[in-house]
């Protein structure tokens, strides 16, 4: 009965590819004698004709220095990444150290990927600069008429609803965002003035939210003005005593 390993070897290799070990009688059970070829062997097949997983390839001793020779012969083919610093200290130093260890400090031709990574990693790159410029808002310069209209409306109405804000912005030639920002800043000053003047409680709740039912509408404001005008006493020409004295 033939050994299974020998059956597998016969399937992958012809009979003349390797010598027949059955005709050789071993003198001892030493590993060296088993692994070495018998003296009457005609010679093994070239390494290129054997597969990597064959019995002959596994038992044959191959020097590992050949792999090192391949690495030393073509260092640029093994390490094809740019070795110059890429702007990021951690990544650039690690790549530079690895490249100097493999190539002995010799510079390799830079790849186009380096320019792409530099733009991404450098803090002053074009993309970061454009984002920083977009985040800044130019300060709005109001005219005297616009400031007078805003102050006059703020005295009457500390908080604006969306329709009122739209009407005020259209009447003053401003945008809704400009009116909203001005009102927020003006309310902060107003709160400080109220607290500094002896007020025990802020006129609004935390986070700038007004109290319940504290935002009067335009109709309510007009009614309050009418009530104030009605409460004022009419201007008289003089008292009755003064009139009698004159007569």
UniProtKB/Swiss-Prot annotation:
One of its GO terms (biological process) is regulation of transcription by RNA polymerase II. It comes from the Eukaryota. One of its GO terms (molecular function) is RNA polymerase II transcription regulatory region sequence-specific DNA binding. The keyword Transit peptide does not apply. Keywords: DNA-binding, Homeobox, Nucleus, Transcription, Transcription regulation. PROSITE patterns: HOMEOBOX_1, HOMEOBOX_2. GO terms for cellular component: nucleus. Residues 223-234 have a biased composition (Basic and acidic residues). Residues 118-138, 197-247 are annotated as: Disordered. Residues 135-194 bind DNA. Its main location: nucleus. Pfam families: Homeodomain. Expressed in smooth muscle cells of the upper digestive organs and their attached arteries and to craniofacial structures. Interacts with serum response factor (SRF). Belongs to the BAR homeobox family. Transcription factor which is involved with the serum response factor (SRF) in the smooth muscle cell-specific transcription of the beta-tropomyosin gene in the upper digestive organs and their attached arteries. This is Homeobox protein BarH-like 1b. The gene is BARX1B.
């Amino acid at each position: 009965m033939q050994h299974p390993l020998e059956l597998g070897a016969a399937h992958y290799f012809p009979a003349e590819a390797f010598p027949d070990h059955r005709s050789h009688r071993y003198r001892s059970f030493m590993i060296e004698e088993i692994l070495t070829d018998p003296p009457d062997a005609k010679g093994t097949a070239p390494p290129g004709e054997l597969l990597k997983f064959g019995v002959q390839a596994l038992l044959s001793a191959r020097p590992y220095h050949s792999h090192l020779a391949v690495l030393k012969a073509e260092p640029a083919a093994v390490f094809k990444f740019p070795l110059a610093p890429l702007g990021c200290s951690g990544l650039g130093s690690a790549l530079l150290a690895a490249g100097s260890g493999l190539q002995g400090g010799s510079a390799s031709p830079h790849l186009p990927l380096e320019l792409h990574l530099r733009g991404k990693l450098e803090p002053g790159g074009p993309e970061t600069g454009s984002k920083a410029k977009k985040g800044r808002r130019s300060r709005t310069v109001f005219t005297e008429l616009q400031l007078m209209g805003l102050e006059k409306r703020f005295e009457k109405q500390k908080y604006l609803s969306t329709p009122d804000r739209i009407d005020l912005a259209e009447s003053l030639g401003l945008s809704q965002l400009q009116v909203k920002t001005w009102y927020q800043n003006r309310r902060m000053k107003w709160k400080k003035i109220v607290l500094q003047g002896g007020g025990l409680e802020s006129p609004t709740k935390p986070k700038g939210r007004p109290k319940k039912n504290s935002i009067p509408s335009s109709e309510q404001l007009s009614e309050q003005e009418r009530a104030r005008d009605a409460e004022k006493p009419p201007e008289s020409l003089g008292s009755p005593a003064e009139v009698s004295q004159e007569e």
